UniProtKB/Swiss-Prot annotation:
Domain of life: Bacteria
Protein's name in the database: UPF0342 protein Athe_0692
Disulfide bond sites: none
Family according to the record: Belongs to the UPF0342 family.
Pfam families cross-referenced by the UniProt entry: Com_YlbF
Organism: Caldicellulosiruptor bescii (strain ATCC BAA-1888 / DSM 6725 / KCTC 15123 / Z-1320) (Anaerocellum thermophilum)
Listed HAMAP family: UPF0342
InterPro entries from the UniProt entry: Com_YlbF, YheA/YmcA-like_dom_sf
Taxon lineage: Bacteria, Bacillati, Bacillota, Bacillota incertae sedis, Caldicellulosiruptorales
SUPFAM superfamilies: YheA/YmcA-like
Length: 119
């Protein structure tokens, strides 16, 4: 039987060779060259993180909080480089989440912390 870590490295290599990863990497490299774009994305992600932390702490997330984040997203995504980066990042994150779910489901590891529990 093959070592699970070796298989994990093979999966990582396959992911690096995927079109989705290549798209993300190219978009990220473009953003990395522009400090203004990097700062815009950083500010957006910081606000997104703060909102998620509020939710996880059981604090009220108001419609105003959500609207403010949506407005910020709409503004920054008017820039085609930022829109491409965020879109590519979301697609890559979805693939990674799908892979995690496939693994968790196949070994019947359904833990609420991972969000895979049957409801």
């Amino acid at each position: 039987m093959r070592n699970v870590y070796d298989i994990a490295y093979e999966l990582a290599t396959a992911l690096k060779e995927s079109n989705e990863f290549k798209r993300f990497k190219a978009a990220k490299e473009k953003i990395e060259k522009d400090e203004k774009l990097k700062q815009m994305i950083s500010d957006f992600k910081k606000k997104q993180f703060e909102l998620e932390q509020k939710r996880l702490k059981g604090e009220e997330v108001t419609s105003s909080d959500v609207y403010s984040l949506q407005q910020l997203y709409q503004i920054i995504s008017l820039n085609p480089d930022i829109e491409e980066y965020l879109s590519a990042e979301m697609m890559l994150a979805k693939i990674i989440a799908d892979i995690s779910k496939i693994i968790a489901d196949s070994i019947e590891f359904k833990d609420e912390l991972w969000g895979f529990a049957d409801k």
